[in-house]
Amino acid sequence: MAQKYFGTDGIRGKANVFPMTPDFAMKVGMAVGVLFRSQRQSRRVVIGKDTRLSGYMLENALVSGFTAAGMEAFLLGPVPTPAVAMLCRSLRADLGVMISASHNPFYDNGIKLFGPDGFKLSDEIEKKIEQLIDTDLSKSLASCAEIGYAKRVEGDIYRYIEYAKRTLPRDVRLDALRIVVDCANGAAYKAAPRALWELGAEVFAINDAPNGTNINQKCGSTDLASLKQKVHEVRADVGIALDGDGDRVLIVDEKAQTVDGDQLIAVIAEHWHKTGRLQGNGVVTTIMSNLGLERFLNRKGLELVRTNVGDRYVVDAMRQKGYNIGGEASGHIVLSDFGTTGDGLVAALQILACMQESQSSMSHLCKRFEPVPQILKNVTIKNKNVLKKNQVKTAIDQATQRLGNEARLVIRASGTEPVIRIMGEGDEREVLDAVVAEMVDVIAHHDALSKVGASLEGS
């Protein structure tokens, strides 16, 4: 059953529009605070945010809710999402909160929740929180003497920087490397350039001047144009693109060519397999990862396990299988030797370590496999249940049969936007084009019929 407020990556929406309003955020703080206060000991919550203007509003609202429930709030300020997960553990907090909409534009925002172990909360706990949100909590709040307090914590970003630096093998330095890092005007604008510089690299930071509205604006992992231009301009060895909250990374090689998350996973998995660091003889990715990655890993005798989209599902599968590498083509890369969630900076450091240890260029290192042709289309919809219609289901089944066993068709509703994502993948491009175009028309047609039906019912 779909959850009421939580999507694939927490609660998300447009700032000052439900559910990203201050009154609702305060209710979330109350509900989460009441639940965790009753189960835990420290009653401590750490709260981080990215650089969106609305972060201030939501931070204050959440603090009001948490303190009303008797929780002590430690405010980290702008930090990457993985820093919240890491500091949640090191500060012995019961809960971690990240205020961010990740790679989305500045006008969106969201609330991500982490448990005391640094892992994102389970669906079961999120459902309990939703039930509490819809409950009158006035009798469950703290007494006057037990109201919590809020404290702004200074300097913890440097704890995260040191943590990230320690993930690099001791005998590896970045001396003489020219690195461009695109901070997306986001949460990693301090941490990423500083860590790379302290490790010896010559660093060129771009999009590192957030103003509240320029996060992810023609920059970062969703728009590599400015990074490619800078890599070419300064003749860099590598370009690193992070997203707004620092949990994704894409790479641009010295030829200004894009390296996506699938290729990065292949590089790390192959290197760790050779050096005996790969656990469980496999890797976890999502249904959106390229078939070429699966074929590459299979040739190495490694298994590829696919999950639904969302790094939380990747992490769940990694824990179940005992694997220490997982990720998504979009650049979420989870390395459980180091952390509990996607970490763009740490993943980039592991790629740089592979590059230094192999003494090869980034373009050579990151060409591990030839991607299978893949087409991705988004259909904006009004009816989120359009995929449940029998006619649509039948059309999807027929299209899947038409593609055959050596190709894939993945159609899913986005967990963060009102769109249906259609991905076709296979060796025969013409067939793919036809099938994907057909499915775009089918879904758009039946969504339009839903709108007509709804208007007739309301007339």
UniProtKB/Swiss-Prot annotation:
<dbReference type="InterPro" id="IPR005844">
    <property type="entry name" value="A-D-PHexomutase_a/b/a-I"/>
</dbReference>
<dbReference type="InterPro" id="IPR005843">
    <property type="entry name" value="A-D-PHexomutase_C"/>
</dbReference>
<dbReference type="GO" id="GO:0004615">
    <property type="term" value="F:phosphomannomutase activity"/>
</dbReference>
<feature type="binding site">
    <location>
        <position position="245"/>
    </location>
    <ligand>
        <name>Mg(2+)</name>
    </ligand>
</feature>
<dbReference type="GO" id="GO:0009252">
    <property type="term" value="P:peptidoglycan biosynthetic process"/>
</dbReference>
<keyword id="KW-0479">Metal-binding</keyword>
<dbReference type="GO" id="GO:0005975">
    <property type="term" value="P:carbohydrate metabolic process"/>
</dbReference>
<keyword id="KW-0597">Phosphoprotein</keyword>
<dbReference type="InterPro" id="IPR005845">
    <property type="entry name" value="A-D-PHexomutase_a/b/a-II"/>
</dbReference>
<dbReference type="GO" id="GO:0006048">
    <property type="term" value="P:UDP-N-acetylglucosamine biosynthetic process"/>
</dbReference>
<feature type="binding site">
    <location>
        <position position="247"/>
    </location>
    <ligand>
        <name>Mg(2+)</name>
    </ligand>
</feature>
<comment type="similarity">
    <text>Belongs to the phosphohexose mutase family.</text>
</comment>
<dbReference type="Pfam" id="PF02880">
    <property type="entry name" value="PGM_PMM_III"/>
</dbReference>
<dbReference type="Pfam" id="PF00408">
    <property type="entry name" value="PGM_PMM_IV"/>
</dbReference>
<feature type="binding site">
    <location>
        <position position="243"/>
    </location>
    <ligand>
        <name>Mg(2+)</name>
    </ligand>
</feature>
<keyword id="KW-0460">Magnesium</keyword>
<comment type="function">
    <text>Catalyzes the conversion of glucosamine-6-phosphate to glucosamine-1-phosphate.</text>
</comment>
<dbReference type="InterPro" id="IPR016055">
    <property type="entry name" value="A-D-PHexomutase_a/b/a-I/II/III"/>
</dbReference>
<feature type="active site" description="Phosphoserine intermediate">
    <location>
        <position position="102"/>
    </location>
</feature>
<dbReference type="GO" id="GO:0000287">
    <property type="term" value="F:magnesium ion binding"/>
</dbReference>
<dbReference type="GO" id="GO:0008966">
    <property type="term" value="F:phosphoglucosamine mutase activity"/>
</dbReference>
<protein>
    <recommendedName>
        <fullName>Phosphoglucosamine mutase</fullName>
        <ecNumber>5.4.2.10</ecNumber>
    </recommendedName>
</protein>
<dbReference type="InterPro" id="IPR005841">
    <property type="entry name" value="Alpha-D-phosphohexomutase_SF"/>
</dbReference>
<feature type="modified residue" description="Phosphoserine">
    <location>
        <position position="102"/>
    </location>
</feature>
<dbReference type="InterPro" id="IPR016066">
    <property type="entry name" value="A-D-PHexomutase_CS"/>
</dbReference>
<keyword id="KW-0413">Isomerase</keyword>
<dbReference type="InterPro" id="IPR005846">
    <property type="entry name" value="A-D-PHexomutase_a/b/a-III"/>
</dbReference>
<dbReference type="InterPro" id="IPR036900">
    <property type="entry name" value="A-D-PHexomutase_C_sf"/>
</dbReference>
<feature type="binding site" description="via phosphate group">
    <location>
        <position position="102"/>
    </location>
    <ligand>
        <name>Mg(2+)</name>
    </ligand>
</feature>
<dbReference type="GO" id="GO:0005829">
    <property type="term" value="C:cytosol"/>
</dbReference>
<dbReference type="Pfam" id="PF02879">
    <property type="entry name" value="PGM_PMM_II"/>
</dbReference>
<dbReference type="InterPro" id="IPR050060">
    <property type="entry name" value="Phosphoglucosamine_mutase"/>
</dbReference>
<dbReference type="InterPro" id="IPR006352">
    <property type="entry name" value="GlmM_bact"/>
</dbReference>
<dbReference type="Pfam" id="PF02878">
    <property type="entry name" value="PGM_PMM_I"/>
</dbReference>
